[in-house]
Amino acid sequence: GIPCGESCVWIPCISSAIGCSCKSKVCYRN
């Protein structure tokens, strides 16, 4: 639930390496 400061409209979350995932076009962590 914490924004990772990254969007995932066109590309996947690079921050997924630290546990972030795409929700509503924005990368979130927990």
From Swiss-Prot:
It comes from the Eukaryota. Transmembrane segments: none annotated. There is a cross-link at G1-N30 (Cyclopeptide (Gly-Asn)). Expressed in leaves, petals, petioles, roots and runners (at protein level). Keywords: Cytolysis, Disulfide bond, Hemolysis, Knottin, Plant defense. One of its GO terms (biological process) is defense response. Disulfide bonds join C4-C20, C8-C22, C13-C27. This is a cyclic peptide. The keyword Nucleotidyltransferase does not apply. Probably participates in a plant defense mechanism. Has strong cytotoxic activity against a variety of drug-resistant and drug-sensitive human tumor cell lines, and against primary chronic lymphocytic leukemia and ovarian carcinoma cells. Has weaker cytotoxic activity against normal lymphocytes. Has hemolytic activity. The presence of a 'disulfide through disulfide knot' structurally defines this protein as a knottin. Belongs to the cyclotide family. Bracelet subfamily. This is Cycloviolacin-O2. It comes from Viola odorata (Sweet violet).
